[in-house]
Regions:
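Short N-terminal binding/cap micro-motifs at the start of the first secondary-structure element
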Residues: 11-15, 134
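Active-site glycine-centered loops adjacent to acidic/histidine catalytic or metal-binding residues
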Residues: 9, 107, 212
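Conserved alpha/beta core of the MobA/IspD/sugar-nucleotide pyrophosphorylase nucleotidyltransferase superfamily
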Residues: 1-3, 159-222
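Short alpha-helical oligomerization interface
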Residues: 19-24
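Short beta-strand-to-loop acidic/aromatic patch adjacent to the donor-nucleotide binding site
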Residues: 99-109
Length: 222
């Protein structure tokens, strides 16, 4: 099993929380977020962690805490300003992707056990509660339509939040899309290229997002 964790961005929505640390190193209790992510997968999992902003801290931490785990660390040189973004970050990992994989955002934590089990087809992990189309990418699902949306400039409560975790089956197509990206949509560009009726939309019971000050505060009780 391969899991890719992009962790290059500056975490601007967290303000002072990320002044000195990458947001994946923010602690919930005694444990950094990145450990909660890594520990949610089987020990034999292979990880690719893509660093940039304050990446030295991540690299040192992972080598100290997980000396026997299969973790490939890639550093990107551009993580803020023009030209930066998730698609650029992912483009630096393409030569190491040679199998289907899980994409796992570095600000997403699940408490659902073995959420990765029996995933064989393209999958987006969704959450039903507190939909916010202005803060999150969402999926519209009804009897007539299935559609993936980026953040919108209006609020809809009848869509489902995309948690930032997905399983990408056709890794060759993904690599081609990211290599030739025109719009900086990251992994969403892959899912939006698919027939939505062929995507597995899996609902997560417990999702904690630490990507903003408000959602981080809710996750601190986890």
């Amino acid at each position: 099993m391969l899991v890719i964790i992009p962790s290059a961005g500056i975490g601007s929505r967290l303000d002072l929380h990320t002044k000195y640390f990458n947001k994946s190193m923010i602690q919930l209790g005694d444990t950094p977020v990145i450990s909660k992510i890594i520990d949610s997968y089987p020990k034999q999992t292979r990880f690719i962690v893509i660093t940039g902003y304050q990446g030295v801290h991540i690299k040192e931490y992972l080598r100290l805490v997980y000396p026997k785990r299969n973790i490939k660390i890639i550093n990107v040189d551009l993580f803020e300003g023009p030209g930066s973004g998730l698609s650029y970050t992912l483009s630096k990992s393409l030569k190491f992707i040679n199998e289907p994989f899980f994409f796992h955002a570095n600000d997403t934590i699940f408490t659902d056990k073995k959420f990765y089990s029996n995933i064989k087809k393209d999958t987006m992990f969704l959450h039903k509660a507190n939909c916010d189309t202005m803060k999150f990418a969402t999926v519209e699902i009804n009897k007539i339509n299935k559609k993936i949306h980026n953040k919108l400039n209006y609020l809809r409560k009848d869509f489902f939040n995309y948690t930032g975790v997905g399983f990408i089956k056709d890794f060759k197509k993904f690599k081609k899309l990211i290599k030739n990206y025109k719009v900086n949509e990251g992994e969403l560009s892959y899912f939006k290229s698919l027939d939505p009726n062929k995507i597995n939309f899996k609902f997560i019971k417990n999702w904690f997002d630490i990507g903003s000050k408000e959602t981080k505060e809710k996750a601190e009780d986890f």
